[in-house]
Structure formats: C-alpha cells, structure tokens
Amino acid sequence: MREIVHLQAGQCGNQIGAKFWEVISDEHGIDPTGTYHGDSDLQLERINVYYNEATGGKYVPRAVLVDLEPGTMDSVRSGPFGQIFRPDNFVFGQSGAGNNWAKGHYTEGAELVDSVLDVVRKEAESCDCLQGFQLTHSLGGGTGSGMGTLLISKIREEYPDRIMNTFSVVPSPKVSDTVVEPYNATLSVHQLVENTDETYCIDNEALYDICFRTLKLTTPTYGDLNHLVSATMSGVTTCLRFPGQLNADLRKLAVNMVPFPRLHFFMPGFAPLTSRGSQQYRALTVPELTQQMFDAKNMMAACDPRHGRYLTVAAVFRGRMSMKEVDEQMLNVQNKNSSYFVEWIPNNVKTAVCDIPPRGLKMSATFIGNSTAIQELFKRISEQFTAMFRRKAFLHWYTGEGMDEMEFTEAESNMNDLVSEYQQYQDATAEEEGEFEEEAEEEVA
C-alpha cells in the first residue's frame, strides 16, 4: 500500500497533530489502545496509509512527534489517544526554541534533527511503497517553523522523489503569541516555497473569524480553532484514507493542483461549519454544501477568493448523496462564477465523493483551492515583516544564533516574488499567449 509518514513539530504542530489522530482513529474505528472496533470494511481497506499493523492486530500511527521541549509531548502522551503512539517516536529536547526561528533551524533544532531522521528512516524503511511525508506545524513559533523547515529540507535530501506535504498554521495578529511571528513566518515561507510539493495554509486569522462570526463564540480558545483544523485535515485526507478514484494519493493531488511548482499554497475550506460538541439539527442539501464550501466565510485562509482567481480546485464530498447532483452543483458553481476560474486551465475543478461522513454529520464537503488570492495572506505577513525589519527590531535574537541579515533580505524578496507570481497568473488570459507566439514567429521568420 501507499504509505504516508506523518511528522508533527512544535507546540502547535503537536496539538493539531494529536487532534488529527483522534479524529481519523475514530473514523477508522480504532480505539485509544490501537484496537479496531469498526463496522465497515471501508475503514480497513486503506488503513496502512497512516497506520502500521503491530503484533496482536494493533494499529499504530506512522507518526513522529518532535519538539524542543518536553511539555507539549507530555500532554499529548497523557491525552485521550496518547497511548496509541509508538513510544520511540517521541523525540524531544529540553531547551526549547523560545519562539526563535534561528534556534529551531540552526542551533537547538540542528542538534536534535539527526535523532528525528533516525526515527523517520526507520518508519520509511518499514513501508512497502512510501508515497511521501506530511508535516503539521505552525509558522509563527520557533520549533515548528525553524526546525520543521529544517526537517523538510533534510528529508528532501534523503527522499528527493517523495512528495512533501505540509499543514502550516499561519500566524495572525488577532491570535498572536509572539511579536516576532512575521519574522518566523517569512523565514519559513522562504523554505516552503522551495522544499514542499503541497502546503495547506491554515490561517489563525480565518479560524478566529469563523469561530467569532459564524459559530458565535465570543472568546475562541485554541481548542475551538483546533476543532476546525482537525475537521479540515480529516476532509483533505479523506481521498488518501478511503477507497476512491480521485486524488487518491499525494502525487495525484499535486498533479491536479499545482500548475507551477512554486505556486503550491492551498486554501482549505469546510462545510458545514460546526462548533465543538454541537450537533447539526438538520442535514444540509448538496446545493447548500456546494454554496457554503465556495463561500469566502468558510475558507481557512483569511483571503477572499473573489479578489483573485482559482488556478485549480479539488472538492471532497462525504456522506451518502447522489453523484449526479454533486456534479450538477459543481458545474453550476463554475458556470455562474466563470470569471473566478482561470480560463487557460480547462476542467480545473475536480470532485471526489466518499461514502463515509465525518462523525456527527450526515454530509460534509471539504474544499481545496489553489487561488491567486492567497497572495493577500503573504502580503499581510510581508507588511508586518517589513515594518519591523526596516528598524532591525528584535534582529539581535537571530544574529545571536549565527544568522546573517542577508538571510532576512533574501526571505523577504522571495516572498515578494511569490506574491508577484500569483499576481501575474491572476492577470493572465488565454488570448495573450497567442499574440506573443505570433510575434516570436515573425522574429524567427
């Protein structure tokens, strides 16, 4: 089977990672001891994508848990599914990264990285046919951002032909832990642009807005935000975990979603939005799901898709529903909003349907969009970065760990280039190309 090795790094990465394993273990009928208690063959058919089968029929997540301090891992271990993980796969330091990207990437993280790679290698070697890696981390802290990106580049070196997929939590001033988040995020994006194949941008700003506006939670906690993240992660991995035709592995997803290698930052969305512990009082119809899924308010990245255009889209519907109706609704969305889809990639919307809905819902839909509007998110970080960097504020924390100012300047310009690349394809039309070609032919003649 096509296995995925999952890594989680730093406090945020471990918290959303632990939540992800709770949710998918539940969907696959696996209890906290790793025993299967499910009721459907579909749950086991592709179980080895994320789980190893151990002696005595126990299922163990193929997960590597990494942090530079023991705190978060202790709470994962004592959490509801803490005993399901392989004890050797907890790799942690004692020093912490102090929200400093340089500590995670160059000093503290670099000391720990080899022991992490040993565990990763061991997991990869026991795979029948490894398809790739997924990492959950945040871009605002020190460990997830600094050490997370270090791990990515090391794994890339060792497994250059495997897919690298990340779930990256983007910082926001609305839910801010540290003042240097824009630095850490910019330095991380600089790495992600070059070293990942697919990155889901999970934006704290958007999660906060959803909790506040849609779910009417006056003081959203990280638990509330993580509930949304785990629903989204469960949705986008559905095609990988359950039998189906479309985007059934990471590489096929990348082929469908990434028209240009640098533009691999996806905007996830989810419908229906529910708050923790609440139940839906009525099942939504397919048209409602489709309409909600494309709504800017349901996006997990704080960008308005109406300010850009979609290069590609993948949608995953879950639950028992009519395929015909799903196809009709998806076509309907494209026809009504055709100006929001680039016309130079025909058939750029793909839809998958999976029979098994997430817990507590009859039907749900997950949205994965590669939209040029994601540049708004990078612009937001870039502005905050520049404001501090032009005064060289807080730089000594980074230079003290051996970093050079030059690296900041490079990261800044790489991010600005990324923004202009998105803009360039947003403005591109199908006709333009023809004109250029004609001119070129004349010159040749």
Curated annotation (Swiss-Prot):
Record-listed Phosphoserine modification sites: S172
Renumbered residue ranges of the record's region Disordered: 426-445
Modification 5-glutamyl polyglutamate occurs at: E438
SUPFAM superfamilies, per database record: Tubulin C-terminal domain-like (SSF55307), Tubulin nucleotide-binding domain-like (SSF52490)
Modification Phosphothreonine occurs at: T55
Molecular function via GO: double-stranded RNA binding; GTP binding; GTPase activity; metal ion binding; MHC class I protein binding; structural constituent of cytoskeleton; unfolded protein binding
Modified residues annotated as N6-acetyllysine in this record: K58
Tissue: Ubiquitous.
Keyword list, A-Z: Acetylation, Cell projection, Cilium, Cytoplasm, Cytoskeleton, Deafness, Disease variant, Flagellum, GTP-binding, Isopeptide bond, Leber congenital amaurosis, Magnesium, Metal-binding, Microtubule, Nucleotide-binding, Phosphoprotein
One GO cellular component term: nucleus
Binding annotation for Mg(2+): E69
One Pfam match: Tubulin_C
Record function comment: Tubulin is the major constituent of microtubules, a cylinder consisting of laterally associated linear protofilaments composed of alpha- and beta-tubulin heterodimers. Microtubules grow by the addition of GTP-tubulin dimers to the microtubule end, where a stabilizing cap forms. Below the cap, tubulin dimers are in GDP-bound state, owing to GTPase activity of alpha-tubulin.
Protein name in the entry: Tubulin beta-4B chain
Organism: Homo sapiens (Human)
